[in-house]
From Swiss-Prot:
Listed transmembrane segments: 47-67, 70-90, 115-135, 158-178, 218-238, 279-299, 325-345, 390-410, 418-438, 450-470, 504-524, 556-576, 602-622, 630-650
Compartment(s): Cell membrane
Keyword ATP-binding recorded: no
Pfam families: OPT
Disulfide topology: none
One GO CC term, this protein: plasma membrane
Record-given protein name: Iron-phytosiderophore transporter YSL15
Family as reported in the entry's similarity comment: Belongs to the YSL (TC 2.A.67.2) family.
NCBIfam families from the UniProt entry: OPT_sfam
The encoding gene: YSL15
GO biological process, one term: response to iron ion
Protein function: Involved in Fe(3+) uptake from the rhizosphere and phloem transport of iron. Plays an important role in iron homeostasis during the early stages of growth. Transports Fe(3+)-phytosiderophore, but not Fe(3+)- or Fe(2+)-nicotianamine. May not transport other chelated metals.
GO MF entries: iron-nicotianamine transmembrane transporter activity; oligopeptide transmembrane transporter activity
Length: 672
């Protein structure tokens, strides 16, 4: 967002009007607001069970995405929808059986959504498709024999150490900013657009109109869930070999198929394309055309000149090196620009606040605009306080545990690296959370990349790769989770949910995720060929992050011939596109591509970009035919497509472990 203050004033009236409309449409809402449940009653056993099930399903989905392309869409809206459908369906079923279940409130809905999101966030935020997988032997071998990639600098995945690492690093971020939650949410009135959007959705569910829509949404979800599950099951029968089945269907001909331009019938990515914006989807397609349609064929013509002809193309000193480092250049250019931008916006906003003439003047200026609803939300938010001493004590205790355990797991990580990371955590977390409240951009991954570079360079050649990957994961988790919690607290603020119940839901979800994510990952890791650059499970970000660590150790000497010049060009392109997006009028912004979205196909191929664009096409057509219906049905249908295809991965992995192979291999060859 280019003008955070303008966005804030735009969003707030919309929320207020929606609340007013809700109150008019549902008179019972006013009575419900007067008798809010105590925070302990907002965290229910049925809610935790529902959150665990939703978290498991979404963990499987995002794990599949993280291990194939790495471009994971935001599923918070889908989580809120499924939480509502599950618990509303449960209470209705009990009522029909003659029972009198406790009412299902928007506060319980909010806690369940928070718990489920915290659970599945571990599946992609924990680094299973990036930093943690970058530690394994296959990624070490793919990175090649460079000086920074020293022999033995790998650690094979294991449930024990992965669960231990996640338990050591995933909770502290939830506590670091608890004492500042009132300042960020109430005093500064930060928008946190994603949290606000989720709150508006949940408030809309718990109205008379929302109840009517829920029946249609449930029907749509179940219909497309069943369709997606059956299609995935049907496809499985034709994948009995290498490069077989509908996932290798040469939609645009065999020449295009060789350059990965084909539709692979992945309903997971069709659903993701319906959730992501048209700009994201078209950016991935543009990246696919530039890389697989233009760049890689041109670079391949210099085989034997730019890189040796007698080594496989999957080697880092071959074509794959160009793919990897040009992808990194786009991601780093995009990330650095946003880092500078958000830091500048944050500093400017804080400077303006601290230079106000007096608090009393500000209060008198804004006091007239405060509604009774706002006062009640603020009162509920302040009343559900969590003692600062408890948050500080918890953070300190978790820091001590991490300082002791992480160096035991990884001898390359010195204890003082961990102390520095935890000391910086609250400072970086506040800057990131404040920026996310203004811009809706969570910079946790960028802080993690910077930490990866710094600690890899600091640790040196022998220890740098593992130290950089592990400490980068630690910093990313500390910063990422604190901003996610503030988004959730904003949702709770607007749904009159106690901060205590929100924090409890967040901690429960995180704890569940610390076990579900490693178990799901290890199931996939043992059943499928994870990390094969020529296979389906490419896991591109594992090699990207390992190469970042090597780059931090070696500098530009790690790059293949002419790769530096190309990387500088792509880095500059990423920066300039962002400058153009912020400088151009609003109507032209949609024409400027997103560099990070463009970068993903560089390694994983064009097929997933085509899947995403099919999802965009479905959304576009639906909006043209019936925009009102599409507004509330698209999240349900997209969730059904993603859940059905994603859940099939679970039984298919069990079949693979049991050595049960599909009976048919469907391939396509040129005609005679």
């Amino acid at each position: 967002m280019e003008h955070a203050d303008a966005d804030r004033t735009r969003v707030a009236p919309e929320i207020g009007s929606l609340h007013d409309e809700d109150a008019e449409a549902d008179p019972a809402r006013a009575r419900e607001m007067e008798r809010l449940q105590p925070w302990r009653e907002q965290v229910t056993a049925r809610g935790v069970v529902a959150a665990a099930l939703i978290g498991f399903v979404f963990s499987v989905i995002v794990m599949k995405i993280a291990l194939t392309t790495g471009l994971v869409p935001t599923l918070n809206i889908s989580a809120a929808l499924l939480a509502f459908l599950a618990l509303r369906g449960w209470t209705r079923a009990l009522e029909r059986l003659g029972f009198s279940p406790r009412p299902f409130t928007r506060q319980e809905n909010t806690v369940v959504q928070t718990c489920a999101v915290a659970c599945y966030t571990i599946a992609f935020g924990g680094g299973f498709g990036s930093t943690l997988l970058g530690l394994n032997k296959r990624t070490y071998e793919l990175a090649g024999n460079s000086p920074g990639n020293v022999p033995g600098s790998y650690k094979e995945p294991g449930i024990g150490w992965m669960v231990g690492l996640l338990l050591a690093i995933s909770f502290a971020g939830n506590l670091s900013l608890i004492p500042l939650r009132k300042a960020l949410v109430v005093d500064y009135k930060l928008t946190y657009p994603s949290g606000t959007a989720t709150a508006v959705l949940i408030n809309g569910f718990h109205t008379a109109q929302g109840d009517k829509n829920a029946k249609l949404q449930l029907h749509g979800f179940l219909k497309y869930f069943g369709l997606s599950l059956f299609w995935s099951f049907f496809q499985w029968f034709y994948t009995g070999g290498n490069a077989c089945g509908f996932v290798q269907f040469p939609t645009f001909g065999l020449k295009a198929w060789k350059q990965s331009f084909f539709f692979d019938f992945s309903l997971t990515y069709v659903g993701a394309g319906m959730i992501c914006s048209h700009l994201v989807n078209l950016s991935t397609l543009l990246g696919a055309v530039i890389s697989w349609g233009i760049m890689w064929p041109l670079i391949s013509k210099h085989k034997g000149d730019w890189y040796p002809a007698n080594i496989p193309e999957s080697s880092m000193t071959s074509l794959y090196g160009y793919k990897s480092f040009l992808c990194i250049a786009l991601i780093m250019g995009d990330g650095l620009y946003h880092f500078v931008k958000v830091t500048g916006v944050t500093a400017k906003s804080l400077h303006n606040r601290f230079n106000r003439k007096s608090v009393s003047n500000t209060a008198s200026e804004e006091g007239d605009m405060v509604s009774l609803d706002d006062l009640q939300r603020d009162e509920v938010f302040k009343r559900g306080t969590v003692p600062s001493w408890m948050a500080y004590s918890g953070y300190f205790l978790l820091s001590i545990i991490a300082v002791i355990t992480i160096p035991i797991m990884f001898r390359q990580v010195k204890w003082y690296y961990v102390i520095i990371a935890y000391a910086l955590g609250p400072v970086l977390g506040f800057a990131n959370s404040y920026g996310a409240g203004l811009t809706d951009i969570n910079m946790g991954y960028n802080y993690g990349k910077i930490a990866l570079f710094v600690f890899a360079a600091w640790a040196g050649k022998d220890n740098g790769v593992i130290a950089g990957l592990v400490v980068g994961t630690l910093v990313k988790q500390l910063v990422l989770v604190s901003a996610d919690l503030m988004h959730d607290l904003k949702t709770g603020h607007l749904t009159l949910t106690s901060p205590r119940s929100m924090l409890v839901g967040e901690l429960i979800g995180t704890g569940i995720g610390c076990f579900i994510a490693p178990l799901t990952f290890m199931l996939f890791y043992r059943a499928f060929d994870i990390g094969n650059p020529d296979g389906y499970w490419k896991a591109p970000y594992a090699l990207i992050y390992r190469n970042m660590a090597i780059l931090g150790i070696e500098g530009i000497s790690a790059l293949p011939k002419h790769c530096l010049s190309l990387s500088v060009g792509f880095f500059a392109f990423a920066v300039l596109t962002n400058v153009a997006r912020d400088a151009l009028p609003a109507r032209y912004k949609k024409l400027v591509p997103l560099p990070t979205a463009m970068a993903v196909p560089f390694l994983v191929g064009a097929s997933f970009a085509i899947d995403m664009c099919v999802g965009s096409l479905v959304l576009f057509a639906w909006n043209k035919m019936n925009k009102k219906e599409a507004a509330f049905m698209v999240p349900a249908v997209a969730s059904g497509l993603m859940c059905g295809d994603g859940i099939w991965t679970f039984p298919s992995s069990i079949l693979a472990l049991a050595k049960i192979k599909p009976p048919i291999c469907m391939k396509f060859t040129p005609g005679s």
